[in-house]
């Protein structure tokens, strides 16, 4: 299937990733640790841990670092005080936003998340206010230049739900979240190394934005992602290649 240009959407403002690399690794390690604490250190018996490991590997985390996080989680440690919290709300232009957190202080967290929404012209909503607009799925993204036919054959045989080829040649492989890590492993074994891979909440309908609104939404997402206890931020904003180039 053909789709709109998505390459720049994989992670908006891609150039900022290097500066945020340490923070990204911290969030990935936290997810691995909590997944191991809740479901045990055996990835074959713990789908959440398996998915967390696949995402970490896609972000070039070393196997030694991953193993240390698993051992830490499986052994208990300070992660026992961390709880998972989800917040939902609306950003500028009515964009739907989901914020997943891991925190040891729920009151502090909700206060700072609410502040970020309010300062950006949005508002924090109630549980379920926007979640119905999203579907949880795995997305494995490849840069332009990959052999589309070969990738499609391997991905579909491995159990992928859909494959989208975008106008710029980038490709997204969509999976059931439970099959995400297995399909990712098969693709790696066959020589297909992704640019990004994660289990995410994908919006069924995207919100189209003008340049000014898109810039405000990006700023809000950046504020939320910069909070230490925020693990992931999802939105239904359609950050097109054109918008990102205009914003710079």
UniProtKB/Swiss-Prot annotation:
Protein biosynthesis found in the keyword field: no
Protein name: Probable transcriptional regulatory protein FTL_0929
Family to which the UniProt record says this protein belongs: Belongs to the TACO1 family.
SUPFAM superfamilies: YebC-like
Keyword ATP-binding included in the entry's annotation: no
Single Gene Ontology BP annotation: regulation of DNA-templated transcription
Subcellular location: Cytoplasm
GO-annotated molecular function: DNA binding
Any Gene Ontology CC annotation: cytosol
Keywords: Cytoplasm, DNA-binding, Transcription, Transcription regulation
């Amino acid at each position: 299937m053909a789709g709109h240009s998505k390459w720049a959407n994989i992670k908006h403002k891609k150039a900022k990733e290097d500066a945020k690399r340490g923070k990204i690794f911290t969030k990935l390690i936290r997810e691995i640790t909590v997944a191991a604490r809740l479901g045990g250190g055996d990835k074959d018996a713990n789908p959440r841990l398996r998915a967390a490991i696949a995402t970490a590997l896609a972000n070039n985390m070393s196997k030694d670092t991953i193993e240390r996080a698993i051992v830490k989680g499986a052994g208990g440690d300070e992660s026992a005080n961390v709880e998972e919290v989800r917040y939902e709300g609306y950003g500028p232009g009515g964009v739907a936003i989901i914020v997943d957190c891991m925190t040891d202080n729920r009151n502090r967290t909700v206060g700072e998340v609410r502040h970020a929404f309010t300062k950006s012209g949005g508002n924090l909503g109630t549980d379920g206010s926007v979640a119905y607009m999203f579907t949880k799925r795995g997305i494995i993204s490849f840069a332009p230049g990959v052999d589309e036919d070969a990738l499609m054959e391997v991905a579909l045989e491995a159990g992928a739900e859909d494959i989208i080829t975008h106008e710029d040649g980038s490709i997204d492989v969509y999976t059931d979240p439970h099959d995400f890590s297995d399909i990712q492993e098969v693709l790696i074994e066959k020589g297909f190394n992704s640019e990004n891979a994660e289990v995410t909440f994908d919006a069924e309908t995207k919100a189209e934005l003008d340049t000014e609104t898109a810039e405000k939404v990006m700023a809000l997402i950046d504020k939320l992602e910069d909070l230490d206890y925020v693990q992931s931020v999802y939105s239904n904003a359609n950050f097109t290649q054109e918008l990102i180039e205009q914003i710079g």
